[in-house]
Amino acid sequence: MATGWQPECLVTQNQSSLGPVEAHSDRALQNTTGNVQSYSDHLTHADIAAREDQLHQLGFKYPHAPHHPQPLSASGLDQQHVAARLHQRKLRRLHSVGPNSQSRRARSSYLKSQKYLEYRRRPRRDTGKDGEPVWSDELEDAFQQALEANPPMGRRKWSERGKSYGRNELIAEYIFKLTGKRRTRKQVSSHLQVLDSFLKGDPDWERLVREASPERSSSVHGSAPAPKWRTAVEHTSASSHYGSHTHGSYHDHMRSMQPYAGDLPPPHYTLGSNMQEAAASTIHGFNFDMWVTAPQQANRIGKALHTYTRLQGDLHHSAASSMPLEHVNGWRSSFPQLASMVDDINNPMDCDIILLEVNLELMTDFPPARSQLGIQLDLDFGHPSAGDVFGVSQMDNWTCSTHIYEDGQKLIESHDDLPKTQSTKVKPLFESSWWAKMFTKVTQDKRMAEDSGNPQVAREADDNTRNFFRSLSAVQELRATSPSSHRLSNQYQGHHGDESKRMAVLVWKFRQTRPGQVGTTTWRRLIPAPDRTSNNSPLAVSGIDLPPLSLDSILLNKASHQGMYQTPQPHDLIPHPSQSHSQWSLYHPPHDNVANLFNPSGHLDFLASISKAEDTINDKIAVTSVLDSFSTSLAPESIPSTSLHGPSGAPVMLNVHDLPLSHPGIGYAMGHEASHYVPSHQHSVNMHDSNGVLHSFFGSNMQPLDDLSHSHASWGAHSTSIPGDVGAGSYHLSYHPEHHGHGPVSRESQQPHHFDSLLPSEDLMDKIVGRMSNGASMHGAGPDAAGYDNSTVDSV
């Protein structure tokens, strides 16, 4: 027995096949695949219809020598009957593409209209950055197909990975996918406007450029149509996307129909559409085997000395159903390369992702010397019925990149060029040299553990081997280049030369079988999460209508925060050098005297006394007058206030300017609800803080009261009632010649004011007062008025 594998006997996967298997038994089996016969057997036992389809395929392959099939069972039919049968077959083929394809083609009648043909005959003057006309015939055809594939969406957006796309952006992307030439959103919009000037009013054109009314669209379509170049349906519906035996759209395509000049090609030939992109990269056949052959034996799995694993189930149908990628436990850590592909927003996953779960049955001993390891990996992109519809056999520059990981850590990375295939089958390489060395090492470790004679060591070696295979994973990426990409790769600016297309991604998971089990491999398709969802644009945020604030809440919010008066700021207060600053006390808004402001009739009663006991205000620095809580024209001054004596025990209230009158001894205390001025308790007169009341006295544009000196305003009336005030509860001011211990305080500066001009002369005031009646009809100012003192007062 050999102690290792012979390196020169390792079978490489890229050996060329020089003949049949029987003549060259030393060749690798993967070059003489065992499923060649299975691909051709269906022609031998096919019925007449299948043979006719084969003839149609030959006619499509060689268009210069068309061959119309002759029915084998109806040789005596006349030519008219044959034409009728061909017409019926043509209709069936049209219906096999889709329910709306024929009607969609018929609705594009504006392409044959005189106006559109006139536009197409115009010379192309504009040249793009790629040096070609902005809308050449090729781009014009792609543009028309993009209009069909991306229906009008109005102001809605098509969202993908956090980015929104409008219809014009989708059309530009569609054109790029179809032709490889970039056209911007603005170019698409401008082209739509130009065509609209020619075709406006045409029903077919209006259908493509105008969104249907909400009533019609909701009743006919039910929901907004989705763009066809990238939709979430291709990821969420595994049966429609991957079902290899249910693809009715690929069976019996229109082989005998050719697109004619001036019209669009059939919709199902649009390689940029969602259906065709998915179909071009869909794998319809798969095979994987790994075996060892003894020396001098035919290098095929039928003559294998030992089979590590082989495919379970049919070559064309997976034994396991499709599964969402997110359901694979730890797929990001197991397949780092796949995670980077999925997260790449610039290169979305538009190909098949195949998961292969490989169970390996290891050898119990070393193979004979000069044994060969065979690995066969085949992927078939051809449909079993339609064959190579999309020209996969014409693609070249096939490459395969392989990444093998252990616990997510990269063990090996390789990039191989594959030979150009002449069929729809591709044979990727799978690192046979690395696998041969790995199998040799695993077998050697197992033999050493068994030779030790210690069962515990043998069990530990077996567990280590199982854990090693369980931690193994691999990712393979297949890419190829279509022939048209060579012509279009460098014809627009900004292209970096990577015109290859990702054709398939294979991800591998491994495990070791239990004793007595056979190594098998199963494959299934993985469905990545959808990366496009249709969302409407959010509506503009409208303003929130808040209820209006009441006057009480405005006064409270303006005067204080949480019941505390703020310390006067420097710009609000100019202190006198001889005055001392004291902190404002807490103000507790009372609730027991609010009702006293209203008389039984529901109106404000300015004559009703507030029964709240007042405190003494001792020589505080006066701030702006509270006569007008909203006024900003009251200039701050440093004015010492008089002392108003009252019962102690209640919190100290606001310091305010005293009202400088020409008669000493009239001290005023402030009612602390709604800013009322209240005289001493022996006088029952309230002065309400109201802009309307003050303006009725002095006018709206007069100088503030703070700036008036006590020697410039003479109150020359026994009792005064101002007409037009607040009604029956008129605003009164009573005067009593008595002193409270403190005379009026003089202001520091006495400047002339214009207050004298507001009042008539003293003689005229005497005459007016003398003529006034003391009756009760003077708006409550007579002797019977509430709160009025009948004592005689000398006029000033």
From Swiss-Prot:
Transcription regulation keyword on record: yes
Lineage, top ranks: Eukaryota, Fungi, Dikarya, Ascomycota, Pezizomycotina
Superkingdom assignment: Eukaryota
GO biological process: conidium formation; sporulation resulting in formation of a cellular spore
InterPro entries documented for this protein: TEA/ATTS_dom (IPR000818), TEA/ATTS_sf (IPR038096), TEC1_TEAD_TF (IPR050937)
Major subcellular location class: nucleus
Subcellular location: Nucleus
Family of the protein in this entry: Belongs to the TEC1 family.
UniProt feature, compositional bias: Low complexity: 235-247
PROSITE patterns referenced in this protein's UniProt entry, alphabetically: TEA_1, TEA_2
Region (Disordered): 61-135, 210-261, 446-465, 728-757, 775-796
Keywords: Activator, Conidiation, Nucleus, Sporulation, Transcription, Transcription regulation
Cellular component terms per the entry's GO annotation: nucleus; transcription regulator complex
PANTHER family for the chain: PROTEIN SCALLOPED, TRANSCRIPTIONAL ENHANCER FACTOR TEF RELATED
Protein name: Conidiophore development regulator abaA
Ranges of Basic residues composition bias in the record: 84-95
Phenotype seen when the gene is deleted: completely abolishes conidia formation and leads to the formation of compact white colonies. Produces extremely elongated and immature phialides with defective morphology.
Compositional bias (Basic and acidic residues): 115-132
Organism: Penicillium digitatum (strain PHI26 / CECT 20796) (Green mold)
Residue ranges: DNA binding: 128-202
Function as written in the Swiss-Prot or TrEMBL entry: BrlA, abaA and wetA are pivotal regulators of conidiophore development and conidium maturation. They act individually and together to regulate their own expression and that of numerous other sporulation-specific genes. Binds to the sequence 5'-CATTCY-3', where Y is a pyrimidine, making both major- and minor-groove contacts. Plays an essential role in the differentiation and functionality of phialides.
Protease among keywords: no
GO molecular function terms noted in the UniProt entry: DNA-binding transcription factor activity, RNA polymerase II-specific; RNA polymerase II cis-regulatory region sequence-specific DNA binding
